[in-house]
A protein has these predicted regions:
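Signature of the first transmembrane helix
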Residues: 19-31, 45-106, 273-293
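Helix-terminus/linker motif at the lipid-water interface of multi-pass membrane proteins
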Residues: 55, 59-81, 150-157, 213-220, ...
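Membrane-interface junctions at transmembrane-helix termini in multi-pass inner-membrane proteins
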Residues: 107, 176-200, 378-405, 421
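Short alpha-helical transmembrane segments in multi-pass integral membrane proteins
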Residues: 1-51, 108-176, 194, 203-273, ...
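Alpha-helical transmembrane segments of polytopic membrane transporters and translocases
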Residues: 82-98, 231-235, 303-311, 439
Length: 479
């Protein structure tokens, strides 16, 4: 070492290596470490550019239902309980199923776009709309007779009647919800995320006005809040449909409606059903909490509070980014940081959050007691949602569905029933049980993600895309 170098050598520097081999090995190790940090930093920036608008748009989309429940909550405890129960039934029997089936587009469109088979994205979007529209027929029948269904499930008669009326006024929302979900995924899988965020923001800003006009100005009460959802979904859909038709960004992926949408429907359904089950099995477990809360003492209070906790959890936790090998590690760090910040914020705001949903002091106080548990739930949910996104990106929805089935239905819900009904923890016990299921899911998904063979997955994705590829001259013809 020369004098100049020695002058800058720290006093407590490590002893120099004793051989040239060691020096080369250390240099190689440091080089790999620096390269890994550089790649991780680049991946984090890329994910934030993509995921930031996606997360924002998902939260803004949840604002529609959230604001509707807020308006109903200020009509009284019974309307809030009825609207909450109807929304939970709609989520269990409709929205969760449709959202889950639409996530098949995340796999198909995402991999087709990566393989530069751009014309397939438009075909997949139309195919998804056909399959989801068919699924709406039985869903509409359940919603039309929601009051009777809830009575059969043992719910309070007054709450069931209120919920039945609310559910019937939610029926028009199906007509807009299906194409809206397909348009959103069609754009997001092309990394076209800012228009989705902008349309969701415009809808979120408009929705409170629509709710006020229908609920109070027109005197429709809770029914007006349900109808407002359909109007806002329709506005969001109209904005995105105009963008797809007019934008140069979608020229290569959308060329109009095509008869190809009616081909290979079975193949789409084969992927859509595991996708739906993966989403539904987790989503249903949270909505079952609301249904179970109707069987507790003071069902109006328990149902109101549990539904608010479910809405808050869904709206904040929506939209975790999807990634692969290196991105998985990066997104877990991001989810960890996000979870800590939002959980802490929820804890600080626990005494004021309830006033957004209800003027009843009893409801507000109960929510304040529940929010610390909800913060823990959200923190865990952020981590396992990121890993679930990895499975969706790989097309492994069957594994995700099996994990959700075991975690929530063999552990979470039985534990919730035990804590709520046998240990008499009521609504708090229901939520603690689901937290137990979430912890099991997180642990299992960590193990599954560590076992993924990424090279094999890349080959399978390529095979899946090109086995479905259409000749360019088969692509849709503009109307």
């Amino acid at each position: 070492m020369d004098a100049a170098a020695a002058a800058h050598e720290p006093l407590l520097a490590a002893a120099p290596p004793t051989s040239g081999k060691a020096t080369a090995a250390d240099g190689y190790g440091r080089g790999r470490h620096e390269e890994g940090r550089r790649l991780a930093s680049a991946e984090a920036k890329r994910l934030l550019r993509l995921a930031g608008p996606i997360v924002a748009s998902c939260i803004l989309q949840c604002v529609v239902n959230m604001v509707s429940v807020m308006f109903v909550g200020h009509l009284g405890e019974l309307p809030l309980a009825g609207a909450s129960l109807a929304t939970s039934l709609a989520n269990v029997t409709g929205y969760s199923l449709l959202t889950g089936m639409a996530t098949a587009m995340d796999t198909l469109c995402g991999q087709a776009y990566g393989a530069r088979q751009y014309h397939l994205l438009g075909v997949y979007k139309q195919r998804a709309m056909v399959v989801l529209a068919a699924a709406c027929v039985p869903i509409a029948l359940v919603w039309a007779f929601a009051g009777r269904v809830l009575l059969l499930l043992g719910q309070d008669a007054a709450i069931a009647a209120e919920a039945g009326a609310y559910a019937r006024w939610m029926l028009p929302s199906l007509a807009a919800y299906v194409p809206l979900q397909c348009h959103i995924r069609f754009l997001q899988t092309q990394t076209v995320v800012l228009p989705v965020t902008a349309s969701s923001a415009a809808t979120a800003l408009l929705h409170p006005l629509v709710c006020w006009l229908l609920v109070f100005r027109a005197g429709m009460g809770s029914k007006g809040a349900a109808l407002a959802n359909a109007i806002s979904y329709g506005v969001n859909l109209a904005i995105l449909a105009l963008y797809v038709r007019a934008s140069n960004t979608c020229k290569g992926t959308w060329s109009g409606f095509s008869g190809e949408a009616f081909r290979e429907l079975r193949q789409f359904a084969v992927l859509a059903m595991p996708s739906a089950m993966m989403i539904c099995l987790e989503w249903w477990s949270f909505e079952i909490l609301v249904l179970l809360s109707g069987l507790l003492p003071n069902p109006q209070l328990e149902t109101s509070v549990l539904s608010i906790c479910t809405r808050v959890s869904n709206e904040i936790g929506a939209g975790q980014p999807q990634a692969a090998k290196r991105a998985t590690r990066v997104v877990m760090y991001m989810a960890l940081s996000e979870g800590l910040v939002i959980s802490f914020t929820m804890f600080l705001l626990r005494n004021v959050w309830g006033y957004m949903y209800s003027s009843e002091q009893e409801v507000v106080t109960y929510i304040a007691r529940m929010l610390p548990i909800l913060g823990i739930s959200f923190f865990i949910d952020g981590l396992h949602s990121s890993l679930s996104g990895v499975l969706t990106g790989c097309g492994k929805q069957k594994i995700g569905a099996a994990v959700n089935l075991g975690a929530f239905y063999l552990v979470g819900i039985p534990m919730a029933v035990l804590l709520a009904f046998f240990l008499h923890l009521n609504g708090m016990g229901l939520w603690l049980g689901i937290v137990c299921g979430s912890i099991i899911k997180l642990l299992v998904l960590i193990i599954v993600s560590c076992c993924i063979d990424w090279e094999k997955e890349a080959i399978m994705a390529k095979d899946r895309v090109f086995s479905s590829s259409l000749p360019i001259f088969w692509a849709a013809t503009p109307l």
